[in-house]
């Protein structure tokens, strides 16, 4: 999901289950928690303060603006000489406080304000608010004052300064950036001071003083309760949003590491330009008729082929682990030499190693690089032979010319090179001599006489060179170039044959002695994080984050300086709230993106029930005040009872829906409607009290009677009821607007519209009544105070609503963006994993991705029974030709790519899921079955079942090639060899890791192909024994001479005895033998390639098996 952060501040119901708990701990769903919540780690707490700095700064500016406006309004009223009760200590202090608040406002408005400085400003503002509040208490400095009605009043009244203290208290909770405990202490001190001063200075003989003090105490309690709730919930929402964003950033960084690791792994297998192009097409396949070919042409490179002479005898004694270790040590060393000599290793085929210089980066001295590479390889293997007293040597062949490089097929990509010049380099290796670098005349011309050479006489040892009259030379090194000291073999007797373990040990020691070389474990260089300490700290922090139970005690990060925290710190330094606000509409604060706005509204408000409970408590407080000081009215009493009952019903309903896990029923529209109705209902109770207390019409004759309309339109004059508690009724109206502040997730726009309506009704009620003529109390003669109070309260609530809305929306935006980036990285990870699984067998790739780099060992696996298949197209070499008209052979390779791609698509079928493509070697396709590990309790398939799958695949390959011939008017013929037996699978080559299988089984399977007959499937006697029980039909071929094995009895697989393969395909001998065109349309024939039997480049006749890579794994004995 993009854009909706799971479990973010109050949104635990939308998105990932448990997301909120992960951020808030087990108690995260309670309405409010103990104060003083903060992270245990100072570093994380500092990050959170930095995260909220700009928003806290904006809130502080709003608080100082309200306080300045309050002090300024009171100062202006004093300046204009508004009548009122006897002057107290506040006389003359309001202008001073106004100046102080304005000065703090200017200081706070500095852009470069730091967290500590903002906290100091908040503390100063709280201190000045305390002095302001104390001076507003009902102290008396002078004698009796005269009311506007002319009546004498006491020296002070109990209601004096209450609304100012209520407003200052709420501002300290909702907008000032001070600690929660400090704000609570402020609220308690202010309330206690007013109550004590009132009790001490108001004349005790005033009737019902205790009732007035009780009403004041209830009002202070209500405001403090609402302030604490707003304070705690706002901070909790921000902390949860911060942790949610941090979790996403942590996951993103972890995924970034994994993706970087996967990218490095991908780059180690393929050149960057090829890998990036293939990755893009693999993830978003373009619509096209033909499969895209990833081939590039390089016209001036040098190709080196090298073969280890005598390796077969050395490896014949080894175990699986020893063989993989030996190969990795040798070829790891060769990879290091290739890097030093600016060569790129292309592939390892058995014990054959070939590389190219000048491929990825053009080099003018590519021939020199390859010669140096060949000489270094000879020196290396000579040192091995001397140290182990094993007859090992290296045969190296070089040629300079043109290559086509890239990847063929759709699965198990392997970078390779093709061209007639590659073929010639391969022949140069086969026609060379051990310990010599064999070069052609073309390569010699590129060396500019920098090396001494001698005639190679390659034509005397190779028919190919003799037929094409190719002159060859040997490089004559001037001296022994590189000697590997450090091995002492005095304890080993030369006459005694060494065991393989001894040979392997000495070989490993030898490989390590030069430049402290140690062959890397394959993929270890791409698995290791650059800073393991950072990774360890990140992992520790992650575990603690997931295991914490609360904010205050078990929160994360005992390890300071983690990578995630440093990353967030840099983000916060670059964060600009103004830019984030650009995503919001300035007036409505809605997101400009409709989809994001919809997802924001889908977040559930887990504190909505708590807000309703608080509204119920406030209604109960109004009921107590009504009973204490306000004249009772049946209408007001009924309204109060209805309000309490409705709120109780709402609370029960919300609790039931929450217990039954139906949070989705409270949509944003329902929550907004409930919020408006509850606020209007509670405010109506307070307004009803006001209506009952204020005189609505006075007779023109007397101030002591009230004119009302009776039934029938008659006017009735009633005696006026003294209502000294009208001030408390008006205070209830002010406090009645506070429920708007506790519904945090209701948008600010409906709140401000509702505030406007409530304020208007309040003013209308006051102006239409004669409230200035109410006898006694603080309202007597102070007509400005009720209007000033409601305007300041409404202004404060409007600013707070907008501030909370901005906070929640920016928190959501930050968390959503972090989660979107995390999800993007997750998609990249999955995409990279798909690509890696296309480069390596899935279980092998997963092994390296899951392994700890520090504990990673060589990957190897022994298998007792594996089916191996080689399928070649021997007459493709007759088809291949390099001409300007076909882009020097690219179009011919395009058709080969179509053939291999169709074979790959055939393997994608579910029936062939147990098959594993190993590689392609020129036009030879190599696959195996029985390599995948069995998962859990899944029954292991028998080798007979595996061989049936392999045989059916081979049969289907004939049909696929037959279809291609039909479409392209070609006559390609398939030749297949199958064998079964033990193999060793592993990954070798640290810098260019490569998965392969080795063993006598692989060699014999290759011989079954190379000694086979076109259009037939040749199998060994063991395969015949296992498959004849599965209704397959065979023809005995007889004894066949196999290199390294002598005479072997082989069979031709003809198909099933019932004429069908195991999944309904038919395999007919006549189709295999006659695959050429049968008429009809064409779809894939490359226009520039001849259909059959083209002349190969002059002087280069077709090779009998593979013109490209004659020194293949098929011809090597591992």
Swiss-Prot record:
Record-listed Mg(2+) 1 binding positions: 307, 351
GO molecular function annotations of the record: adenylate cyclase activity; ATP binding; calcium- and calmodulin-responsive adenylate cyclase activity; calmodulin binding; metal ion binding
Catalytic reaction(s) noted: ATP = 3',5'-cyclic AMP + diphosphate
EC number assigned by the record: 4.6.1.1
Record note on disruption phenotype: Mice appear grossly normal and healthy, but have decreased levels of calmodulin-sensitive adenylyl cyclase activity in the brain. They show impaired spatial memory. Mice show a significant reduction in daytime contrast sensitivity.
Cofactor comment text: Binds 2 magnesium ions per subunit. Is also active with manganese (in vitro).
Chain intervals with Pro residues compositional bias: 1087-1104
Residues annotated as binding ATP: 307-312, 349-351, 395, 919, 996-998, 1003-1007, 1043
Obligatory cofactor(s): Mg(2+); Mn(2+)
Pfam families (UniProt xref): AC_N (PF16214), Guanylate_cyc (PF00211)
Polar residues bias spans: 1105-1118
Binding positions for Mg(2+) 2 per the UniProt entry: 307-308, 351
Key words, A-Z: ATP-binding, Biological rhythms, Calmodulin-binding, cAMP biosynthesis, Cell membrane, Cytoplasm, Glycoprotein, Lyase, Magnesium, Manganese, Membrane, Metal-binding, Nucleotide-binding, Phosphoprotein, Repeat, Transmembrane, Transmembrane helix
GO biological process: adenylate cyclase-activating G protein-coupled receptor signaling pathway; axonogenesis; cAMP biosynthetic process; cellular response to calcium ion; cellular response to forskolin; intracellular signal transduction; long-term memory; modulation of chemical synaptic transmission
Ranges of biased composition (kind: Gly residues): 1-18
Membrane topology: Multi-pass membrane protein
Annotated glycan sites: 703
Disulfide bond positions: none
Tissue specificity as recorded in UniProt: Expressed throughout inner ear development.
Residues modified as Phosphoserine: 550
Residue span of region Interaction with calmodulin: 492-519, 1023-1046
Summary of the function given for this chain in its UniProt record: Catalyzes the formation of the signaling molecule cAMP in response to G-protein signaling. Mediates responses to increased cellular Ca(2+)/calmodulin levels. May be involved in regulatory processes in the central nervous system. May play a role in memory and learning. Plays a role in the regulation of the circadian rhythm of daytime contrast sensitivity probably by modulating the rhythmic synthesis of cyclic AMP in the retina.
Oligomeric form and interacting partners: Interacts with CALM.
Domain free text: The protein contains two modules with six transmembrane helices each; both are required for catalytic activity. Isolated N-terminal or C-terminal modules have no catalytic activity, but when they are brought together, enzyme activity is restored. The active site is at the interface of the two modules.
The protein, known as: Adenylate cyclase type 1
UniProt organism field: Mus musculus (Mouse)
């Amino acid at each position: 999901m993009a854009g909706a952060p799971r479990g973010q501040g109050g949104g635990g119901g939308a998105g990932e289950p448990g997301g909120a708990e992960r951020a808030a701990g087990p108690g995260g769903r309670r309405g409010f928690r103990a104060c003083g919540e903060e992270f245990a780690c100072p570093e994380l707490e500092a990050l959170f303060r930095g995260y909220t700095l700009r928003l806290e700064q904006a809130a502080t500016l709003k608080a100082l603006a309200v306080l300045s406006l309050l002090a300024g309004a009171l100062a202006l009223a004093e300046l204009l000489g508004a009548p009122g009760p006897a002057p107290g200590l506040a006389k003359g202090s309001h202008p001073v406080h106004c100046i102080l608040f304005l000065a703090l406002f200017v200081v706070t408005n500095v852009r470069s304000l730091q967290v500590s400085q903002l906290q100091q400003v908040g503390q100063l503002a709280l201190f000045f608010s305390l002095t302001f509040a104390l001076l507003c208490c009902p102290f008396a400095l002078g004698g009796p004052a005269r009311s506007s009605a002319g009546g004498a009043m006491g020296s002070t009244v109990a209601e004096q300064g209450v609304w100012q203290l209520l407003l200052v208290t709420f501002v300290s909770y909702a907008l000032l950036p001070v600690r929660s405990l400090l704000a609570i202490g402020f609220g308690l001190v202010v309330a206690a001071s007013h109550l004590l001063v009132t009790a001490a200075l108001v004349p005790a003989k005033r009737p019902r003083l205790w009732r007035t003090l009780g009403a004041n105490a209830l009002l202070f309690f209500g405001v403090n309760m609402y302030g604490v709730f707003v304070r705690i919930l706002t901070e909790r929402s921000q902390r949860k949003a911060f942790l949610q964003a941090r979790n996403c950033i942590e996951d993103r960084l972890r995924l970034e590491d994994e993706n970087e690791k996967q990218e490095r792994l991908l780059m180690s297998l393929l050149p960057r330009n090829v890998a990036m192009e293939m990755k893009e097409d693999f993830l978003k396949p373009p619509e096209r008729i033909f499969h895209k070919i990833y081939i590039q042409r390089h016209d001036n490179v040098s190709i080196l082929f090298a073969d280890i002479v005598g390796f077969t005898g050395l490896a014949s004694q080894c175990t699986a682990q020893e063989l993989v270790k030996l190969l990795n040590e040798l070829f790891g060393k060769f990879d290091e030499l290739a890097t030093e000599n600016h060569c790129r290793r292309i592939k390892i085929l058995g014990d054959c190693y070939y590389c190219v210089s000048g491929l990825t980066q053009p080099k003018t001295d590519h021939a020199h690089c390859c010669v140096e590479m060949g000489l270094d390889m000879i020196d290396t293997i000579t040192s091995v032979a001397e140290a182990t007293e094993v007859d090992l040597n290296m045969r190296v062949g070089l040629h300079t010319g043109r290559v086509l490089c890239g990847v063929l097929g759709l699965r198990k990509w392997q970078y390779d090179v093709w061209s007639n010049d590659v073929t010639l380099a391969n022949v140069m290796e086969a026609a060379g001599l051990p310990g010599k670098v064999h070069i052609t005349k073309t390569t010699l011309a590129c060396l500019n006489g920098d090396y001494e050479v001698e005639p190679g006489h390659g034509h005397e040892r190779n028919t190919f060179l003799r037929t094409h009259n190719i002159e060859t030379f040997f490089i004559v090194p001037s001296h022994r170039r590189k000697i590997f000291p450090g091995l002492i073999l005095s304890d080993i007797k030369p006459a005694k044959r060494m065991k393989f373990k001894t040979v392997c040990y000495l070989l490993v020691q030898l490989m390590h002695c030069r430049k402290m070389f140690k062959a890397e474990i394959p993929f270890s260089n791409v698995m290791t994080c650059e800073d393991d300490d950072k990774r360890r700290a990140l992992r520790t922090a992650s575990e603690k984050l997931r295991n914490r139970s609360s904010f205050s005690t078990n929160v994360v990060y005992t390890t300071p300086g983690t990578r995630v925290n440093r990353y967030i710190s840099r983000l916060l330094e670059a964060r600009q709230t103004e830019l984030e606000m650009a995503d919001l509409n300035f007036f409505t604060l809605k997101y400009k993106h409709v989809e994001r706005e919809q997802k924001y509204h889908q977040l559930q408000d887990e504190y909505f029930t708590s807000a309703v409970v608080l509204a119920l408590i406030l209604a109960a407080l109004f009921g107590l005040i009504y009973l204490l000081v306000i004249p009772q009215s049946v209408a007001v009493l009924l309204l109060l009872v209805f309000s309490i009952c409705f709120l109780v019903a709402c609370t029960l309903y919300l609790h039931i829906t929450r217990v039954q896990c139906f949070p989705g029923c409270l949509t944003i529209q329902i929550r907004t409607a409930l919020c408006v109705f509850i606020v209007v209902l509670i405010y109506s109770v307070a307004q009803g009290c006001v209506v009952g207390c204020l005189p609505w019409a006075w007779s023109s004759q007397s101030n002591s009677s009230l004119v009302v309309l009776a039934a029938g339109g008659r006017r009735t004059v009633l005696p006026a009821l003294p209502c000294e508690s009208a001030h408390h009724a008006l205070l209830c109206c002010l406090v009645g607007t506070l429920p708007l502040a506790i519904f945090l997730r209701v948008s600010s726009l409906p709140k401000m519209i509702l505030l406007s309506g409530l304020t208007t009704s309040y003013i209308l009620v006051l102006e239409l009544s004669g409230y200035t003529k109410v006898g006694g109390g603080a309202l007597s003669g102070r007509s400005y105070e009720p209007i000033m109070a409601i305007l300041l309260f409404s202004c404060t609530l409007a600013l707070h609503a907008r501030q909370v809305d901005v906070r929640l929306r920016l928190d959501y935006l930050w968390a959503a963006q972090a989660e979107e980036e995390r999800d993007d990285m997750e998609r990249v990870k999955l995409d990279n994993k798909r690509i890696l699984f296309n480069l390596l067998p899935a279980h092998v790739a997963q092994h390296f991705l899951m392994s700890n780099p520090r504990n990673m060992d060589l990957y190897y696996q022994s298998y007792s029974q594996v089916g191996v298949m080689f399928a070649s197209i021997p007459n493709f070499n007759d088809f291949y030709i390099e001409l300007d008209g076909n882009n020097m052979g690219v179009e011919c390779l395009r058709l080969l790519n179509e053939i291999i791609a169709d074979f790959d698509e055939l393997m994608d079928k579910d029936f062939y899921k147990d098959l594993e493509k190993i590689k392609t070697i020129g036009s030879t396709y190599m696959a195996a079955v029985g390599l995948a590990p069995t998962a859990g309790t899944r029954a292991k398939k028998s080798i007979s079942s595996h061989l049936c799958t392999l045989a059916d695949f081979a049969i289907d390959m004939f049909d696929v090639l037959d279809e291609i011939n039909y479409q392209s008017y070609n006559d390609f013929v398939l030749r297949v060899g199958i064998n079964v037996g033990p193999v060793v699978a592993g990954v070798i080559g640290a810098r260019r890791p490569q998965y392969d299988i080795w063993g006598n089984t692989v060699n014999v399977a290759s011989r079954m192909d190379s000694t086979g007959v076109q259009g037939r499937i040749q199998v060994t006697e063991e395969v015949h024994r296992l498959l004849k029980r599965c209704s397959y039909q065979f023809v005995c071929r007889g004894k066949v001479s196999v290199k390294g094995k002598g005479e072997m009895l082989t069979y031709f697989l003809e198909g099933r005895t019932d004429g069908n393969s195991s999944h309904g395909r038919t395999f007919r001998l006549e189709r295999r033998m006659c695959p050429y065109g049968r008429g009809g349309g064409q779809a894939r024939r490359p226009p520039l390639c001849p259909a059959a039997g083209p002349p190969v480049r002059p002087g280069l006749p077709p090779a009998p098996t593979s013109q490209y890579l004659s020194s293949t794994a098929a011809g090597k004995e591992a």
